[in-house]
Amino acid sequence: MMKTVLYICSSFLSLCSFGQDTAHTAQYRQKLLKAYPDCITGFDKNYVVFKNGTRLLFDDRKVKTLTEQYSNADIEDQLKAAYIKGKTPKPAEFDDPGRIRNDSFFKCMYGATPAAVKQNLATITWLPGLAPQSLQVTRINGVDKQLQAVSDELEKLPAFLKYVGKAAGTFNWRVIKGTTRPSTHSYGIAIDINTDFSNYWQWDNKTTDENRKIPDYVNRIPFEIVAIFEKHGFIWGGKWYHYDTMHFEYRPELLAD
């Protein structure tokens, strides 16, 4: 009798867990479709299907350590950590919504080589009325238009010019320091604003060890700037435990309702 009860309880819990996983999976898939309608056509069982014919595994069903998630994330992994829009407290320990990425996902959309990415770069004029600067970002998924819209709104806030008036860079095919992982700058979907008023966990703590605890969170970027970027599909590196307050990247799937 006891074995029967235990089996029934175990089966019930498994079904509950499966239902939760299914609900989360459906939510994640809707976010991807809403965020990237120009690139993603739909899903075939456990695969994301792209308009160019590529099929990428959505969930490899593996339980991973933090290090394994950084180095070998599937597409589901990059959606698990919730990015919260709006004003938030400092990030919780090792909470990095958006830093865990499936590189094949971004290479499929934006290009797998520098030459492929460059074919789709567009030049925008950043802050044309205050501190004009030519910046190159991808036109895929309308990133160039969204960043220009950010610029248009920031021009209405001249008091914050010192933070945004000297952008440190956009497209740059490179890896993240201390890793072999591509930076999102490689895909032309990221911008670093003025480093003179920014903070970065590696600089402040003189380490590249992602498993090391960071004693202090440091930020000088006003939230009004962050809100404008988020409105147009860009997440902020200041909401990462491994903070990078100069950094914004186009990740609408993490901002989709």
Feature map (PLM): residue ranges:
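Bacterial Sec-dependent N-terminal signal peptides
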Residues: 1-21
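Cell-envelope/glycan interface and biosynthesis
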Residues: 24-240
